[in-house]
């Protein structure tokens, strides 16, 4: 082979691209990784400084059933620790704070409780109909894909409190608005993360743990192992498949050649690349139609854990339109040092507040923390970190790309479909924990096996492989109560009461008529 010639070119040095390259090397192949940034990690980004020791400004959370990322972390000796949830969480709504335990805030209004319960139960039930590997094949795919989550919430929610929390549920999980996302896509997204409880929970859920020392250790470990196969500051500008080898050009005028290419970047970033021949129509239209979510990740550091002294763990669920933050988690180091609270500015709020100065965002965040926690100590941080992922040229947003109405059924089937000698990875193409680091690993390794299958090195039946459960982070089932399984919806309850009232009235009228001899055989 000539210089800059490889078996496979992997475009994207995030977790997905690096895990793809790692598997190729482990299988005896010679890949190269081209990363546009001056660092590896993609949408994971760990910063080290004296104030924070280390801080994850990007993807950070892992939990039970995320077995692939846990396997790779273990290979590099990266330990996990549990996000603190020993004390009470806080639900802030209508200007008041309500401590609670568990993944979801309790509802004391019986109608609101029925509405909340029916919301989660209905989403999980609908998700059961959706195949993880092909959501467009769901029995009601066309109907659900034409509907936004806002329309679905309007259809199944009776109370304002349920609709309000449902909006936050979408904001938190996919950093977009209910009116922006397809119901089919969002229901699939929740389903492939294990359901409403698994995706939203800290304990036993997707946010249970973090990596001690930061999530970027995973990418850095793979990059060290790959050595000079990883090329930084190599933004790809063109891919030419017309020759015997695929030719990839970078903006710094380097040329790389290989038999196959794996694109391990968000679908929308394909628009930065010129393709020869042009992409097929559906693929070309898909990459124009899947925007990225919007989020600013914010860490506020304090002298001490004053919230724990008040009996709070640091998790806040904040339902107030003027509040910048929607959800927080404790971000204190596992040894108890560097007390901090992590908060997300989500979706519409991240776009609205992006024009503020950094100091103004910090001030507003500290003010809402002071109100929610009932402590003026929140007003006096010792340090602040933030990352607006919407300004990242080579991400375009975070956490993941989302599908607006109508896109999944028309274009979803080409998301992973190879184009000639081009194969597609990236967390968006995963079928388990898409949008998370776990999905990035699944997608990268699957794309590598697709390439090896094309090379004749393995059978097609070996492309998709399940992962053994992590023994270090076992998953526990979520147990529902009798009432959670059988409590009627508000609509069902009112219908039952209406029928019951009618029957009671009819019975009373019948008794009166019978007593007066107006009915025969009485």
From Swiss-Prot:
UniProt xrefs under SUPFAM superfamilies: FAD-linked reductases, C-terminal domain, FAD/NAD(P)-binding domain
Q: What is its EC number?
A: 1.4.3.21, 1.4.3.4
Entry-annotated residues carrying S-8alpha-FAD cysteine: 398
Any one biological process term the GO annotation gives: catecholamine metabolic process
User: Transmembrane segments in this chain: where?
Assistant: 493-513
Q: How does it assemble?
A: Monomer, homo- or heterodimer (containing two subunits of similar size). Each subunit contains a covalently bound flavin. Enzymatically active as monomer.
Write down what this protein is called.
Amine oxidase [flavin-containing]
Question: Which gene is transcribed and translated to give this protein?
Answer: mao
């Amino acid at each position: 082979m000539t210089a800059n010639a490889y078996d496979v070119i992997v475009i994207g040095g995030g977790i997905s691209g690096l895990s793809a390259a790692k598997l190729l090397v482990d299988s005896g192949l010679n890949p190269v990784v081209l990363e546009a940034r001056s660092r590896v990690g993609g949408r994971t980004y760990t910063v080290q400084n004296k104030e924070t020791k280390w801080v994850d400004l990007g993807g950070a959370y892992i939990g039970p059933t995320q077995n692939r990322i846990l396997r790779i972390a273990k290979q590099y000796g990266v330990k996990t620790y549990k996000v603190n949830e020993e004390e009470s969480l806080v639900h802030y709504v209508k200007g008041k704070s309500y401590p609670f335990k568990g993944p979801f805030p309790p509802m004391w209004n019986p109608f609101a409780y029925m509405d909340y319960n029916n919301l989660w139960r209905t989403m999980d039930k609908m998700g059961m109909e959706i195949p993880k590997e092909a959501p467009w094949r769901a029995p009601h795919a066309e109907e659900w894909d034409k509907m936004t989550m806002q329309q679905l919430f309007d259809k199944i929610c009776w109370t304002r409190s349920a609709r309000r929390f449902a909006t936050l549920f979408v904001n938190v999980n996919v950093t977009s608005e209910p009116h922006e996302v397809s119901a089919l896509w969002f229901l699939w997204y929740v389903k492939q993360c294990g359901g409403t409880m698994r995706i939203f929970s800290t304990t036993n859920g997707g946010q249970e743990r973090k990596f001690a020392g930061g999530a970027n250790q995973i990418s850095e470990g793979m990059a060290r192992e790959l050595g000079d196969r990883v090329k930084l500051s190599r933004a790809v500008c063109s891919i030419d498949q017309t020759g015997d080898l695929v030719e990839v050009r970078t903006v710094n005028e380097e040329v790389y050649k290989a038999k196959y290419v794996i694109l391990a970047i968000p679908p929308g970033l394909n628009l930065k690349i010129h393709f020869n021949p042009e992409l097929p129509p559906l693929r070309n239209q898909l990459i124009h139609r899947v925007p990225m979510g919007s989020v600013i990740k914010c860490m506020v550091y304090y002298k001490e854990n004053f919230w724990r002294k008040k009996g709070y763990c640091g998790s806040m669920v904040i339902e107030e339109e003027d509040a910048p933050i929607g959800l927080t988690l404790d971000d204190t180091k596992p040894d108890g040092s560097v007390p901090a609270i992590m908060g997300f500015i989500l979706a519409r709020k991240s776009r609205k507040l992006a024009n503020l100065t950094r100091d103004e965002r910090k001030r507003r965040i500290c003010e809402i923390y002071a109100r929610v926690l009932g402590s003026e100590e929140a007003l006096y941080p010792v340090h602040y970190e933030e990352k607006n992922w919407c300004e990242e040229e080579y991400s375009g947003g975070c956490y993941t790309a989302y599908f607006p109405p109508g896109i999944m059924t028309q274009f979803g089937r080409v998301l992973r479909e190879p184009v000639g000698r081009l194969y597609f990875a990236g967390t968006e193409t995963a079928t388990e924990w898409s949008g998370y680091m776990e999905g990035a690993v699944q997608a990268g390794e699957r794309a590598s096996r697709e390439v090896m299958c094309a090379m004749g090195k393995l059978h097609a039946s070996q492309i998709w492989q399940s992962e053994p459960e992590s023994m270090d982070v076992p998953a526990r089932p979520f147990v529902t109560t009798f009432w959670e399984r059988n409590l009627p919806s508000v609509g069902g309850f009112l219908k039952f009461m209406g029928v019951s009232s009618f029957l009671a009235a009819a019975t009373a009228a019948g008794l009166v008529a019978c007593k007066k001899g107006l009915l025969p055989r009485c």
